Amino acid sequence: MGMVSRYADMPPVIIKPRLEDPSIKKASANTNRILQEIGENPVALNTLAMEQSKLRPLFKDFDAENVSPEELGDFGKQLLAFGLVDNLTADLMGRAALEFDKDGKITHPDVKINALEFFAKRIDEMQTKVLTGDKYSKLLLPDYIKTVHVMKNLQVFASTGDSYGTMALNKRIKDGEKIKDELLPAKLKSKV
């Protein structure tokens, strides 16, 4: 009998590197870890009131991972004007920038950034400072976390047009649960 080698007559394999879209900026592993640590807060932004007021057209272009500091500040001002966020959250959204000039103004207000990554880095820095006893960081940390929750909720609302409550009710209906008509928003009444 002849000897059989596992390397004999194998067809050649060519591995091509996957082409990636340079416009897509991926978050680092540290950013993803921090975002997972702070979790979700579906009630950080009252998207049900936004849904009922039909505010989706104002926010339909919102993408927290690809937004300029100027746009993020405008979105924060709009949320503040409708009474959906407090002044500090709107202010934090308006100050998300990588570079400032000597007068404290944003140097490149139209350059797109990943706002979630920006805030995750600040949260990481603050968590480190809190461990060393920095009281100012300890005071501001919850506000930065709330701002991330608001941006995440706004991104879901902008992409789907639904509030967290509507999405939860929709899931319950799909699972076969019977819900009274008076508890349902108008667009879900037809699904029951």
What are these regions (language model features)?
Residues 1-192:
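Type III/flagellar secretion export determinants
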